[in-house]
């Protein structure tokens, strides 16, 4: 299933940048960066549980925000891409890690 993950991490405290890096790393473990704070992750239900738990353990609910969008398996009908950055089809395009 395709998950769209967005986040906003506060830099008002000294740990903000470290949280930002950890959140991005967790997302990169399962997907690709679509924009600075937006990731597209193709995960199984079990992987989603692990990823979501990692993200919820990392962010600070008092000053950060996370959003999870369940796009499911028929996501191609729900996503349109326009603009300069090329779109990555995580099911078709080759990713080199």
Where are these regions (language model features)?
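Intrinsically disordered, low-complexity boundary segments flanking structured domains
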Residues: 25-27, 52-57, 80-84
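Short acidic, gly/pro-rich beta-turn/loop elements at beta-sheet edges
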Residues: 15, 51, 78
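Short, intrinsically disordered low-complexity segments
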Residues: 35-72
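C-terminal structural segments of small proteins and small subunits
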Residues: 61-97
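Extended, hydrophobic alpha-helical segments
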Residues: 1-34, 38, 42, 46-47
């Amino acid at each position: 299933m395709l998950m769209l993950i967005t986040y906003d991490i506060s830099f008002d405290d000294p740990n903000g940048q470290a949280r930002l890096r950890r959140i991005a790393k967790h997302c990169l473990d399962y997907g690709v960066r679509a924009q600075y704070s937006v990731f597209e992750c193709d995960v199984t239900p079990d992987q989603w549980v692990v990823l979501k738990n990692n993200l919820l353990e990392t962010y600070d609910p008092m000053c950060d925000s996370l959003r999870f969008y369940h796009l499911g398996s028929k996501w191609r009908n729900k996503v349109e891409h326009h603009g300069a950055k090329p779109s990555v089809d995580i099911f078709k395009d080759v990713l080199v890690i």
